[in-house]
Amino acid sequence: MNLSSIRGAVRAFAAVLVTVGVSAPAVASTINQNTSWTIDRSGTTTKYRVVAYGDSIYAGYRGSVFNVAKRSAPWVDGEYLSTKWASDIEVVRRTKSGALASDIYNNKIVGERSYMQATSTRAVSFEMCGNDGLQARSSFAGQSGTCNYAVLNTALNNCTTYTPLAMQAINQYATTARVKTVSNLYYPGYNADNGLAKCTDSATGQRPNRQNVFLPYVARINWRTCNFASQNGFQCVDSFAQWMGADYDSNGDGQVDSVALRYQQGESEAAYVTRITTTLRSTLRDSNAHLVSAGTSYDYLQSDDTHGTYYGSATISSGLFGGGSGSGAPDFSNAQIVNGQNPQWNRFGHERMGHGISLFDPATPN
């Protein structure tokens, strides 16, 4: 390793210290976590590529800067595609944990566009607004005195700016992709936010409930994400509905909660926000206890109350010195995937999101 490489590694390690919470002022708390894994199906040599761009969610972050969960949402989708197409699937994740939407757009989607330009690419997916929201939430929660909502509006505006730009770039570069998807945001820490802010609202003179403040912003981001998808030839994976709503009808309105919460094409932003924050508010559930039935729940969030849980213990190296790669057989056989669902599809956060992506997969690769 030459001197330049050593210096680069030191800078990367400093960034890692911030990412894991060790004090290192003036260093950005982001780290690239790139991986490539080929799902090697027996009896075929045909290989197609899935490319995923995003932050720690698509990375499969699991509390380590050295490795990520193998079965993150894009990998799960890749396994479904391998079954559907009877082919090998290379799952390429170009992700940056801690990154804002602008960073993901500029340095991952545009800066690393060559990965989706490969002629073997058949599916591209991205997510990008989570850290804008998390950082704005943290900033607001730390305020005292008069509440300043500007940080929340900035996060909303940045997501509104970079989401369609990301779609336009993917449309330009991923010319062989059969399907393009974007995931909207689930709400991590929903229950934890159900408390009073430290600051005082200038209009009411009262300390606002943090959940009441944040939920409308999440709803606006999600409506805009799905609306931009419809305008740019993308499919919107409604992770908010799938994670935050029970998989049965809890309020007796005749609809399964996770279905009733979905984005509806043609619905106005104002109507969607009202439906999420008021009409169906009572059906929202913290993802730490996602109800698949009235008596059965599964934890979709890790102990950090932010990142999705994942099936199995397998990991892929990533982080400081570049990405990790590997290959292996599918985890689930064709016989285990029934009606497009593996046996774990609704028991872990990443399994649920990966299944959500797979709902839009075409029947054939060409």
Predicted regions and their residues:
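Bacterial N-terminal signal peptides
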Residues: 12-21
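Serine-esterase "nucleophile elbow" of acetyl-processing enzymes
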Residues: 29-95
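Alpha-helical cap/lid subdomain in secreted, periplasmic
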Residues: 110-303
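Histidine-centered active-site loop/cap adjacent to the catalytic His
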Residues: 266-366
